[in-house]
Amino acid sequence: GDRVAMRALMRSRNFDAVIHFAGHIVVPESVSDPGKYYRNNVLGSLNLIECCEESGVGLFVFSSSAAVYGNPATIPVHEETPTNPINPYGRTKLITEWTLKDFAERTGSNLPLRYVALRYFNVAGASLDGALGQATPEATHLIKVACEVACGQRDSVSVFGTDYNTEDGTCI
């Protein structure tokens, strides 16, 4: 994020909290271009966290991801499920969670940071004009793909995995 613009905005208003939804989210792209994800998701988040601190904003909601779990040993996952991200996207989300934890637990700060990290599974949504969200042709998210199949724009939905504890071994 643009730290100068963020700092100016935060100082011009009296914000109580920040809800951080920004970030790159395409897993295959994170594998092919990890630097893009670390620069945007980790450094951008750090800039925002530091701007919050400088501006006296002590409440922070972070849009993390279930990708921080990787391939969990047990299903369903819960808050105590061990994290083990398997791609750069998941790692950037976990690093940002750790960063928030470190700022929250830090000693000597005049402003204690209180935060929550929300670990979503399949997020859906887009602006009506298609400028934001999963309305792009290359988006691979389950809900978007399933809607495309239902509308006849795609032939099928791929289901990955065959070793789940279900009747047919799939995750469904």
Regions found by a protein language model. Name each.
Residues 1-126:
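N-terminal Rossmann-like NAD(P)+-binding domain of SDR-like oxidoreductases, especially those catalyzing
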Residues 101-172:
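NAD(P)-dependent short-chain dehydrogenase/reductase
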